């Protein structure tokens, strides 16, 4: 399924200045220990989650209460996670191109400090223009506003990144920046424009946080077809990221949830990425993964998770960040597929997939990554979603 079509149906643009509520004083960024000795070693496995706050989703940036967040972090740490991917709702943080909200920056600092206390590292996702089926666009941008080439947009983006780096730098539990949440689903561009912007953003982020690991967390489309960023440029990054969902990629068209197109999707996409890199010897990060099959019960989701990660480990995937930590509260309007994706329920119960995640993290975290030694196929010659799927099915030796 094309997520842009989903967004067009289910989303309404949320933009404009956000009134600041009274904020707690920012916690001092205490020097905290990183999650483990693994650090940024891409040759050792790590397990984390995409954090979804149990209370008020990411609207919590505007209705700040550290109590529920602390409970969330305790529960996530108890599952054996060592890192979280955080979503900064862009218009909440930067409602004006020349101003970033200090109150929201203080809340980010608090969150980073609370995570550090629990030995959880942070990947901070910056330009979150869409998330879970909703658009979040700042008042100075629309989908057609030249996100990648407009000089005024570039100035606003640079201000935001610089302000974030200032807040993040004192904390020692920082992984780095993720450019945004699947930027290609929100802002499209010809490949040369997307690649040039990506190169400049990597340069800026490396200057500001030179010890960080910075990534571009696109969805599957740039890997499956020509879309905004070239697969070759993405694969040349220090740590290519893939977002893998049987539902969104269309894997469920080629078999059931436990058939190879779904349970070996992570493994297949890692091979696809390496085919564009031209070598088996590169680390790959599963930055988001789940089935997004809303009719799959907990037991089935847990079984899929176990099989998918084992297959990905065999194919040399380095880090795993599950989508997501907590189910979404039904008091909010979301597409039904979004409500039950957590390892924990909204009230904190550990689900069956949460227990499997805990077992996988205990078994593999810190273990050395073994890259595959099989010959690497050439990239798909047909750069369409269907053409890429035929390439994957051939690699899987699966006939739908």
Where would I find each of the regions flagged by the language model?
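Active-site mouth of glycoside hydrolases
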Residues: 35-237
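Substrate-binding cleft of secreted/luminal carbohydrate-active enzymes
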Residues: 289, 294-339, 357
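N-terminal export signals
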Residues: 5-25
């Amino acid at each position: 399924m094309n997520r842009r079509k989903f967004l067009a149906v289910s989303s309404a643009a949320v933009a404009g200045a956000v009134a600041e509520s009274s904020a707690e004083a920012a916690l001092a960024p205490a020097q905290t220990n990183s999650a483990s000795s693994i650090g940024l070693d891409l040759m050792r496995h790590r397990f984390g989650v995409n954090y979804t706050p149990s209370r008020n989703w990411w609207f919590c940036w505007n209705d700040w209460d550290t109590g529920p967040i602390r409970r969330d972090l305790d529960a996530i740490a108890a599952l054996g996670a060592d890192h979280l991917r955080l979503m900064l709702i862009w218009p909440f943080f930067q409602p004006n191109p020349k101003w970033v909200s200090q109150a929201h920056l203080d809340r980010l600092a608090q969150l980073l400090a609370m995570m550090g206390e629990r030995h959880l590292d942070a990947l901070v996702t910056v330009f979150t223009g869409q998330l879970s089926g909703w658009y979040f666009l700042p008042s100075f941008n629309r989908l057609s506003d030249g996100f990648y080439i407009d000089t005024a947009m570039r100035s606003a983006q640079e201000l935001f990144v610089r302000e974030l780096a200032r807040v993040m730098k004192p904390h020692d539990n920082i992984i780095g920046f993720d450019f945004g949440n699947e930027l290609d689903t929100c802002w499209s561009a010809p490949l040369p424009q997307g690649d040039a912007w990506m190169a400049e953003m990597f340069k800026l982020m490396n200057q500001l946080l030179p010890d960080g690991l910075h990534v571009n967390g696109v969805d599957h489309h740039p890997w499956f077809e020509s879309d905004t960023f070239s697969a070759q440029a993405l694969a040349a990054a220090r740590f290519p990221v893939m977002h893998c969902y049987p539902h969104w990629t269309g894997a469920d068209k080629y078999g059931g949830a436990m058939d190879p197109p779904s349970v070996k999707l992570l493994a297949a996409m890692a091979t696809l990425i390496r085919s564009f890199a031209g070598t088996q010897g590169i680390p790959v990060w599963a930055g988001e993964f789940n089935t997004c099959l809303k009719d799959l019960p907990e037991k089935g989701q847990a079984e899929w998770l176990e099989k998918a990660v084992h297959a990905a480990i065999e194919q040399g995937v380095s880090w795993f960040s599950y989508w997501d930590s907590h189910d979404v509260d039904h008091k909010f309007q979301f597409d039904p597929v979004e409500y039950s994706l957590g390892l924990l329920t909204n009230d904190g119960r550990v689900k069956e997939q949460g227990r499997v995640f805990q077992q996988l993290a205990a078994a593999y975290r810190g273990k050395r990554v073994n890259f595959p030694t099989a010959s690497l196929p050439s990239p798909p010659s047909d750069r369409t979603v269907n053409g890429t799927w035929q390439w994957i099915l051939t690699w899987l030796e699966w006939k739908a």
